[in-house]
Amino acid sequence: MSEAVMTANETTHRAEWGDTAVLQAQGLVKAFRQGGLNVDVLRGVDIRIGVGEKVAIVGASGSGKSTLLHVLGGLDVPTSGRVSLLGKPFTAMSERERNTLRNRALGFVYQFHHLLPEFTALDNVAMPLRIRGENEAQARHTAQAMLARVGLGERTAHRPGELSGGERQRVAIARALVGSPACVLADEPTGNLDDHTAGEVFDLMLELTRTLGTSFVIVTHDIDLAGRCDRILRLRDGHLHQER
C-alpha cells in the first residue's frame, strides 16, 4: 500500500484518538502465590504506546513478558496499578465493559495460532466481526478481503489442518487485524516457525500494521526481529528498561 494511504490511515486514527496513548499502563504490579510465597513478576511497570507505534518487549524466559501482555490486554488483572485503553480506564471497567472494548480496540496473535479447527479460514477470520454484531454478509466480505491481504485469498475454504504452519499464522494475523483494532498484542507470534517463514510472517505483520495505522506490541526472543520495531524494551527483575 502506498505511503499516502499509510499516512491517511494513521491520520484517521490520530483524528479519532488525538494525542491520547492507544495503550498505557502505570505502576503495574502482578504477584503470584507460589510454594507459600508471594512472587512479584511485575514490580511497577510503566509503558505508553502511541498511535501507530511498534514496540518489542524482550527478556529472559520466565521474566513475565507474557504476563505483562495478558495484563495489558485485559486477559488478566494486575495486583495493583492501572491500564488505560484509548484513554478509557480499562482495568476499572466491569468484565462486560472490558470485553466490549477489547473486542473493538485490540487484536491478539499468539505463538500457537488458536484457530478453531472445525471452521474454515474465512469463518475463523470473520469470528471477531460476528461477535461484534456485524451481519453475516458484511463479516464474510471483510474477512475475505483481509485474507486476500495476507496472501490467502485462494485458501479461504481450507480448515487449519489443511494449511501449513506459516499459512495458519497468516490466518491468525488476519483475524487479529480484521476489525481494524487500535493495537495488536503479539506473544511470540513467530516462535513456532522456521527462520525463513518467521521473517516472512513478521514482515507481513509490520507491513499490515503500518498500512492500517495500527499500534503493535510484540513479545519476542528474536533480537533481529525486535530490531525492526520503533522501540525495544527489556523486562528484567519486574521492570521495563528501554534498550532502544
Curated annotation (Swiss-Prot):
Keywords: ATP-binding, Cell inner membrane, Cell membrane, Membrane, Nucleotide-binding, Translocase, Transport. ATP binds at G59, A60, S61, G62, S63, G64, K65, S66. One of its GO terms (biological process) is lipoprotein localization to outer membrane. SMART domains: AAA (SM00382). It is found in: Cell inner membrane. GO terms for cellular component: plasma membrane. InterPro entries: AAA+_ATPase, ABC_transporter-like_ATP-bd, ABC_transporter-like_CS, ABC_transpr_LolD-like, LolD_lipo_ATP-bd, MacB-like_ATP-bd, P-loop_NTPase. Coiled coil: none annotated. It comes from the Bacteria. It is an enzyme of class 7 (translocase). One of its GO terms (molecular function) is ATP binding. Residues 23-244 form the ABC transporter domain. Its EC number is 7.6.2.-. Pfam families: ABC_tran. The keyword Nucleotide-binding applies. Its main location: membrane. It is a peripheral membrane protein. The complex is composed of two ATP-binding proteins (LolD) and two transmembrane proteins (LolC and LolE). Part of the ABC transporter complex LolCDE involved in the translocation of mature outer membrane-directed lipoproteins, from the inner membrane to the periplasmic chaperone, LolA. Responsible for the formation of the LolA-lipoprotein complex in an ATP-dependent manner. PANTHER family: IMPORT ATP-BINDING PROTEIN, LIPOPROTEIN-RELEASING SYSTEM ATP-BINDING PROTEIN LOLD. Belongs to the ABC transporter superfamily. Lipoprotein translocase (TC 3.A.1.125) family. This is Lipoprotein-releasing system ATP-binding protein LolD. It comes from Ralstonia nicotianae (strain ATCC BAA-1114 / GMI1000).
